[in-house]
Regions:
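Short, small-residue-enriched loops and turns at beta-alpha junctions
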Residues: 16, 35, 67-71, 159-162, ...
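Short cysteine clusters
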Residues: 20, 24-27, 253-256, 270
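Conserved, mostly hydrophobic/aromatic
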Residues: 16, 20, 24, 63, ...
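Conserved small/polar residues in nucleotide/adenosyl-binding loops
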Residues: 272-274
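Canonical Radical SAM [4Fe-4S] cluster-binding loop centered on the CxxxCxxC motif
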Residues: 4-44
Length: 274
């Protein structure tokens, strides 16, 4: 499926709910109004639309939110997506709080991989970012995912004055674990617009000073992590890798291959809504 800019779109993000059980300062702080229940698409409607996208060439679906695991029966949605002809991969982005308890059902449904948000390794910083005391449950979810063997990526948003002093420690999680730790630049939109950005190039320089052998992965090797905007680096001997998504300083719009379907059924291409 090609858009008006002749980009090949084959990746669909489904925002299955606007609800979340965290209140991250840059995403959904306290006071954000939730949608009326009848305004949110049913799973049947999501599956019907996903099937139409598959007929147009979409082969990968990512289930997101809000927090997708707060919506009951999301494993049934995953199973339904996996049954659609042409859909070869179904993945999920989650904050991890409910992951440990729901992972068996998700694996049985055919979930192919999971991305888990983790901005800090310190419980008190986690609570300051999210306004919730859920750090232990997130780490439990990460451990459960790693133990299950499902491919795991950790997503971290570097934040000035919040977690900038522990970014090397977060990157080092990839040293002894078979996962990708990805650093995503703060987007200057919504609540993040008032927050300064720590750039991907700045982080790469920091990590190269910490680990002199820190170097980019060959394109053929990093291709196995998906065809998104992340650029991957590693250190010889590490079990995992470190990725950078330069949402501000990068220039990857021309090669974008994805669209988002919001929980209300709006189609989002970049920052445009249809």
């Amino acid at each position: 499926m090609f858009d008006s800019a002749q980009r090949n779109i084959h990746y669909l993000r489904l925002s299955v709910t606007d609800l979340c059980n965290l209140r991250c300062r840059y995403c959904m702080p306290d006071g954000v109004e939730k949608l009326e229940r009848e305004a949110v698409l049913t799973y049947e409607e999501f599956l019907r639309l996903a099937a139409l996208f598959a007929r147009c060439g979409v082969d990968t679906v990512r289930v997101t939110g809000g927090e997708p695991l707060v919506r009951k029966g999301v494993d049934q949605l995953v199973a339904g997506l996996k049954s659609i002809p042409g859909i070869r991969k179904v993945t999920m982005t989650t904050n991890g709080i409910l992951l440990a308890q729901q992972l068996p059902a998700l694996l049985a449904a055919g979930l192919d991989s999971v991305n888990i948000s983790l901005d800090t390794l310190r419980p008190e910083v986690f609570q300051s970012i999210t306004a919730r005391d859920e750090f232990g449950h997130v780490m439990e979810g990460i451990r459960a995912a790693l133990d299950s063997g499902i491919p795991v990526k950790l997503n971290c948003v570097p934040q000035v004055g919040v977690n900038e002093g522990e970014l090397e420690d977060l990157a080092a999680l990839a040293e002894s674990r078979p996962l990708q730790v990805r650093f995503i630049e703060m987007m200057p939109i919504g609540y993040g617009a008032a927050m300064p950005c720590i750039s991907g190039p700045e982080l790469r320089e920091r990590f190269a000073r910490r680990w002199p052998e820190f170097s980019p992965l060959p394109a053929a090797q990093s291709a196995g992590f998906g065809d998104g905007p992340a650029v991957y680096y590693t250190v010889p001997g590490w079990k995992g890798d470190v990725g950078f998504i330069a949402a501000v300083h990068g220039k990857f719009c021309a090669s974008c291959n994805r669209v988002r379907l919001t929980s209300q059924g709006f189609l989002q291409i970049g920052r445009a809504h249809v």
